[in-house]
UniProtKB/Swiss-Prot annotation:
The family this protein is said to belong to: Belongs to the 'GDSL' lipolytic enzyme family.
InterPro entries: GDSL (IPR001087), GDSL_lipolytic_enzyme (IPR050592), Lipase_GDSL_AS (IPR008265), SGNH_hydro_sf (IPR036514), SGNH_plant_lipase-like (IPR035669)
GO biological process: lipid catabolic process
GO CC annotation: extracellular region
Record's keyword terms, sorted: Hydrolase, Lipid degradation, Lipid metabolism, Secreted, Signal
PROSITE patterns (UniProt xref): LIPASE_GDSL_SER (PS01098)
Catalytic center residues: 35 (nucleophile), 313, 316
The organism's place on the tree of life at top rank: Eukaryota
Entry EC number(s): 3.1.1.-
Protein name in UniProt: GDSL esterase/lipase At5g63170
Amino acid sequence: MNSLVIQTTIVLVSVISVSIVHAGNIPAVIAFGDSILDTGNNNYLMTLTKVNFYPYGRDFVTRRATGRFGNGRIPTDLIAEGLGIKNIVPAYRSPFLEPNDILTGVSFASGGSGLDPMTARIQGVIWVPDQLNDFKAYIAKLNSITGDEEKTRSIISNAVFVISAGNNDIAITYFTNPIRNTRYTIFSYTDLMVSWTQSFIKELYNLGARKFAIMGTLPLGCLPGASNALGGLCLEPANAVARLFNRKLADEVNNLNSMLPGSRSIYVDMYNPLLELVKNPLRSGFISPTRPCCCAPAAPIPCLDASRYVFWDIAHPSEKAYQTIIPPIIQQIQQSFA
């Protein structure tokens, strides 16, 4: 019995060592935010904002729906793979987490969420700041696995924290909710969003995080949910608001670098790379720039080949679109944090 315990301990220690060494200076990818990074947390919530059913996930490695808002893998997975950490980033709320999942990173993101508490409340999902409660529990689990607070601190301080928030605040909460759009101008609301972002990053910093990759919003007016109302043309007012927020967010990222000693934050542009696919789809092998493959009134029957479509559904890019725009982001992360 004692021999079995000793052998198990040796194996666990070996797993920890391999995980830390394998990824070099970046041992883990940890994600927060919305459906761009949610790998299945909403499956375990009482919410209608979930996609744990066919045809979602049909091109995933298991050919099954996982709760990811797409036909296959999403940026969380692709970034972790590109950094040499692992191919799949599990959802923190999954009951099937293994020790190595904890060691190499998980996603706390919740599809439909945002920086504004009203955004999450409307959809019954996990508000971005409330995702920190799960992160605190994660730290305790991580510490129990490493058995060493210094190792735990090292993993957290060297992990890359990827954040995607703001898409739903603009597209859903501000544009459709008079409680917000009658009280705030779009200028004051985007200022508020940036302030919420700063507070969230500060909280993560206080919990030991030091490397932040902060994503801007997508070109919201080009999402099929908006563009299809104009016959496939991008809705410029929505894009203008996205650009406004992204400019302010990029400025705030620079402020964070001077505000938080020993940390490094980078702004990750999601807007322009996706807009390029919409404007010049054939250049990257796509045939449909704004018509989704699936799950829309105009496309009730899924397309045969999602890799030819920029968008999977009315709000989310296809796996192929992500595979096209994520490699430069991986390079940016490597150059900034490695």
